[in-house]
Amino acid sequence: MAGCVQVPWYATGFRGDQLQAELERVSALSVRYGATGYVVYRGRDDRYKFLQVLEFDDHLDWDRYWAGPEMTDFRIYCQGWFQVPVVYAWNDIVSRGEAVRREPVHAAPADGH
């Protein structure tokens, strides 16, 4: 069953922007391991709070990504940029929806010009 992994990250003092850049970079690499999508959220009320969300069809693909060389290097390189422990949660996707975005329609003036 397809799953969504949620990984909460909390940056240490003055490291939020650096952690954001690295989370964006390493999240994009997840598709090499079979991820079907990813999102990185940053809190508006708390700019040090991040949520990395990755979707995989197979839990084993997630395990390969998390233990792979890129994520290992990320955790070594960014050591001290985030609070530990980092505890992720695998969730089964049971329902999904998405709004269809349409281009706005501009009405013509009543006189036709």
Spell out what each predicted region is.
Residues 1-72, 83-113:
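Short S/T/G/P-rich N-terminal loop/turn motif that feeds into the first structured element of a domain
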